[in-house]
Amino acid sequence: VIAYRGGLGMGKTAFTRGLARGLDCRDRVTSPTFTIVNEYQGRIPLFHFDMYRLPDADALFDIGWEDYLDRGGVCAVEWSENVAEALPTDTVWVDLRRLEGEDNGRRITITGVTGF
């Protein structure tokens, strides 16, 4: 699981596009804001989630979250703050922040397990 933290327009979907490219996913990556999850096939599956509209972590189980975890792909989670308590302990966290004084600059901090 890769969990993004950052406000609107910080580049969460853009980061996922790069991830998809690295996994050789051929489909165009779009934000799953209204669908909750988009699936992409590549060397391994990529499941792109947008948790913005979920009321709480309990709603994850209504969308089959555990099934996605068991499918052996990468789960990229936008708005992970809304469901943080339900994410696995080995989640990789990607914090995206705007660089002060720059419209398009970002500081990206990646934390979590090592050796992935």
Locate predicted features.
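Alpha-helical phosphate/pyrophosphate-handling elements in metalloenzyme active cores
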Residues: 25
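Short hydrophobic/aromatic beta-strand immediately N-terminal to the Walker A/P-loop
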Residues: 1-3
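Conserved lysine of the Walker
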Residues: 12
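Short phosphate-coordinating micro-motif centered on Lys-Gly-acidic
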Residues: 21, 58-116
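Conserved nucleotide-sensing/catalytic segment adjacent to the nucleotide-binding pocket
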Residues: 28, 33, 39-79
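P-loop (Walker A) phosphate-binding loop of NTP-binding proteins
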Residues: 5-7
